[in-house]
Every structure is written in C-alpha cells, then in structure tokens.
Amino acid sequence: MPVRRFFRKRRFKNFVSDYECCTTILDVGGQHYTWPIIGRVDGITLLNISVPQDTGGFQYVQGSGCEMPFADGAFDLAFSNSAIEHVGSVENQFKFASEMMRVGKRIYCQTPSRLFPVDPHLTTPFLHWLPISWLTPRLLRYFTLNGWLWKKPYEYDVTWISKRKLKKMFPGCKIKTERFLLLPKSFIVTSG
C-alpha cells in the first residue's frame, strides 16, 4: 500500500547508515519485502511463527519472538517493525522485549502509537479507539480500508503499548517518538 511504503521509507531513511556496521541482523516477525525498501539485503535472518512459501531469497527460521532459538548476542542487531503489539498478552510483550535484548548486541524495535488517529493495522481512522469488544470481524471487514481491500473477515489481534510501558520493557534503551503532523505515530526503541 503506497501510504505504508511512504512511512516505511521515511522511517528507514537513516537506518542503513546508522546500522551499516551490523553484519548479522535478525528481523523478528518481519517479512522479506521490507528489506529492499530499507536498502539492505545481506546478512538478514527472519524469525516468524510460519515460514512463507516465497522467501524472496532470504533465510527464514520458524519460531516465536517470545522464545528465540538463538544464543545470547547471536546477532549484531535484533530488529522488529510492528510485531511486538501482535504477541498477545503484556507478559508475552515483556518476553519478546527480553529476547530481543538477549539475542541482539543492539536493538531496533518499532511499534505504532495508539494516540495516532489512524490505526496502521486497519488503515482506518478512529476505530482503534473503540472498546475492543466492538471490533467484530464483520465491522472490521465492512468498515475498514483493509477489509474492503482484502475482502475477508479480519481478527483484531493488537495489544497497544504505551511509551511508559516500553520504558519498562526495554530498560536502558532510548525511545524516540516518530511524529506525523505533530501527532505521535509510533515509538522506536534503540540500544547501542
């Protein structure tokens, strides 16, 4: 989707220069199509619950971000873009954060802000501010842009994370607020 591509390009404008010294990168919960947008394709391993049929020539490992099958410090960078909010419970989010800090010598973890009026998962304004019980598959299918594009029921599996909670999950890390039109669009956690 062009809007998502615009924000990804903007977010990753300085990524390559900031992390060019990282020869091994673990992308937790990501997809291979993100990396050509960033401008990097070498030394990347993707960890996902399921491995897609089309791997795009990238190395995938099947596993959970809450229990990673790698040694401590196995990667120069543990990277995650919009995945930590999908692991379920707050307890799982803390496990995910802990595992990123364990396997990566440096980390980069981005998650969207609930305060932004457009939910990037739905590509629709304001619905994510409703009580979760209202976000039925039927509502998500017929009243969201993603529902119209995908034409299938959608299960809303997002557990939003505040900046304050991120500080607890990632002690000692920097947290930057990415803004659009002065509004907090997402939070980016970095270390190293």
Q: Which ranges hold each PLM region?
A:
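Class I SAM-dependent methyltransferase Rossmann-like catalytic core
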Residues: 1-20
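Conserved SAM-binding loop
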Residues: 19, 23-117, 190-191
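Conserved class I S-adenosyl-L-methionine
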Residues: 106-137
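Short, glycine-/aromatic-enriched active-site segment of Class I SAM-dependent methyltransferases
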Residues: 122-125, 140-154
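Active-site phosphate/pyrophosphate- and oxyanion-stabilizing loops and adjacent acidic/basic residues
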Residues: 13, 94, 98, 164
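Conserved S-adenosyl-L-methionine
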Residues: 172-183
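Short hydrophobic/aromatic beta-strand or adjacent loop that forms the aromatic wall/cage
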Residues: 158, 182-189
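Short alpha-helix
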Residues: 151-173
